[in-house]
């Protein structure tokens, strides 16, 4: 276990920043809600992937990679998938059409989030692989009296849950049943005992995918969205460590961290807690619940109707048009992906984020400067990160990525390549290919002496501070004649004047 300051994380459940103490330091466990694979992931979907990848890296650094399990699910059973399959493959058998939609969409998602610099989670369970666990949990909930069968559906009753000892329904959202009912889009159905009851299982219509049903229901059916995550987290984070439905030890039926976007607090995460806590008789499903904030695009809510709906693939294909065409398309995707990652990490994960083309371009410029220094000094990635103290300290304070990036800027300014490179690695911003390879277009436009250019830029900044504009302009013009274009700006952290440069022509 590496030394680190006490990790403190904001817990949505308690609305407090809490010291993180894993249930078992040898088996730290985290679950994050993943994609429903029916369409390309949009740029808002990228945010939780990046946020919890940084947390995954931090936990691995502190507790050891072999002691951390990160599960991110794949939802491959959903009405939206069915609709997309019917639209895109009308001539195929329905199950084959669904398979094509889910396989191709998942493959695209994996490629896109990898380009953003993310590690693969430890496990990525698919809903279709865990029907047995879902049926078993539903049977348990019916037996306990918090779920019931009606017209071949199985429904969970929040009011029945609140009549039992244990956690209250609504504790995560901090709302009463009446408040949740008033603010929710509730499916009205005659077979419900109460409007707030939600579906655990529903019958499949003819031609739709279906599986053997729980609770003695004779017709084929499929699960509701919420039970899928309860079952998959049980399968990957409880059962392998001695927990599950056969275990009556409450501590073995909890895990450490559950994450996702703020939009999932209600109803999805509220319903997960209800199902899991009732099934296992626990006070908590996960000890800490973390949620990232919303994303806007150029100051507006992202929406297809506004014409500002941007997928991750759109960003990778078109986000930095000034890069031109690269022979190595995969490397180009990764370069833009790292710029997108840096852009997102400049906003604290719990705050709303404003995605802009300008910030993406500025992040790419900053990466260019950082990698330029690492390339000049022949930085090599060590097996163990030992010079990441300031970055770890920042991230240990509720993933304060802005302060962590400020530490990287400080290391760059001091020409501390070890602190810069290792800190970039911990944040997922370091791709060794861009340090070592000779044929990277953004670095291979011309052979230039980086140190000499930086020295002349420093001299120019001195002239600017002295208000000697003629000499400052002379250096700028000389560099441009040599194929080096300067771009003036301000350090986002300090407000100091900065100058970046690029090789042109």
Swiss-Prot record:
Residue sites binding ATP per the record: 304
Manner of cofactor binding, per the entry note: Binds 1 zinc ion per subunit.
Location (main, coarse): cytoplasm
The keyword Metal-binding belongs to this UniProt entry's keyword annotation: yes
Superkingdom of source: Bacteria
CDD domains: CysRS_core (cd00672)
InterPro entries from the UniProt entry: Cys-tRNA-ligase, Cys-tRNA/MSH_ligase, Rossmann-like_a/b/a_fold, tRNA-synt_1_cat_dom, tRNAsynth_Ia_anticodon-bd
Keyword tags: Aminoacyl-tRNA synthetase, ATP-binding, Cytoplasm, Ligase, Metal-binding, Nucleotide-binding, Protein biosynthesis, Zinc
HAMAP family on file: Cys_tRNA_synth
Protein name, UniProt field: Cysteine--tRNA ligase
Species, as recorded: Brucella anthropi (strain ATCC 49188 / DSM 6882 / CCUG 24695 / JCM 21032 / LMG 3331 / NBRC 15819 / NCTC 12168 / Alc 37) (Ochrobactrum anthropi)
């Amino acid at each position: 276990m590496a030394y680190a300051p006490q990790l403190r994380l904001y817990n949505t459940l308690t609305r407090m920043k809490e010291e993180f103490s894993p249930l078992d330091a040898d088996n730290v466990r985290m679950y994050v809600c993943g994609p429903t694979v029916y369409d390309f992931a949009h740029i808002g979907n990228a945010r939780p992937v990046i946020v919890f990848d940084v947390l995954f890296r931090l936990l691995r650094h502190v507790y050891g990679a072999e002691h951390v399990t990160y599960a991110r699910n794949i939802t491959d059973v959903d009405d939206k998938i069915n609709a997309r399959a019917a639209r895109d493959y009308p001539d195929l058998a329905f199950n084959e059409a669904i398979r094509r939609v889910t396989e191709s969409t998942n493959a695209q998602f994996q490629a896109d989030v990898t380009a953003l610099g993310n590690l693969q989670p430890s496990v990525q369970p698919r809903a279709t692989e865990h029907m047995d666990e879902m049926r078993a949990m539903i049977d348990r909930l019916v037996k306990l009296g918090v779920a019931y069968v009606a017209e071949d559906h199985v429904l969970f009753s929040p009011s029945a849950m609140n009549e039992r000892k244990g956690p209250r329904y609504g504790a995560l959202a901090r709302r009463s049943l009446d408040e949740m009912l008033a603010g929710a889009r509730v499916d009205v159905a005659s077979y419900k005992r109460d409007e707030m009851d939600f579906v655990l299982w529903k019958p499949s219509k003819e031609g739709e995918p279906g599986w053997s049903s729980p609770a003695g229901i004779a017709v084929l059916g499929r699960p509701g969205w919420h039970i899928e995550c309860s079952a998959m987290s049980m399968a990957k984070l409880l059962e392998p460590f001695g927990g599950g439905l056969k275990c009556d030890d409450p501590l073995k039926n909890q895990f450490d961290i559950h994450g996702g976007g703020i939009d999932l607090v209600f109803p999805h995460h509220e319903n997960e807690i209800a199902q899991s806590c009732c099934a296992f008789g626990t006070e908590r499903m996960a000890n800490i619940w973390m949620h990232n904030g919303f994303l806007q695009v150029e100051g507006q809510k992202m929406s297809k109707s506004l014409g500002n709906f941007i997928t991750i693939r759109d960003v990778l294909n078109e986000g930095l048009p000034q890069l031109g065409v690269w022979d190595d398309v995969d490397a180009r995707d990764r370069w833009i992906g790292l710029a997108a990652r840096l852009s997102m990490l400049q906003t604290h994960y719990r705050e709303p984020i404003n995605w802009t083309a300008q910030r993406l371009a500025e992040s790419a410029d900053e990466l260019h400067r950082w990698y330029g220094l690492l390339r000049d000094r022949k930085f090599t990635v060590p097996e163990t990160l030992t010079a990441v103290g300031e970055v770890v300290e920042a991230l240990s304070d509720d993933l304060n990525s802005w302060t962590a990036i400020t530490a990287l800027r400080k290391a760059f300014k001091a020409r501390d390549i070890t602190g810069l490179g290792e800190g970039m690695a911990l944040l997922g911003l370091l791709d060794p290919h861009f340090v070592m390879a000779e044929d990277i277009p953004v670095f291979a436009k011309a052979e230039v002496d980086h140190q000499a250019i930086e020295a002349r830029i420093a001299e120019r900044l001195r002239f600017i501070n002295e208000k000697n504009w003629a000499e400052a302009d002379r250096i700028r013009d000389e560099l441009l004649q040599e194929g080096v274009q300067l771009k003036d700006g301000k350090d986002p952290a300090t407000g100091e004047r900065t100058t970046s440069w690029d090789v042109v022509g």
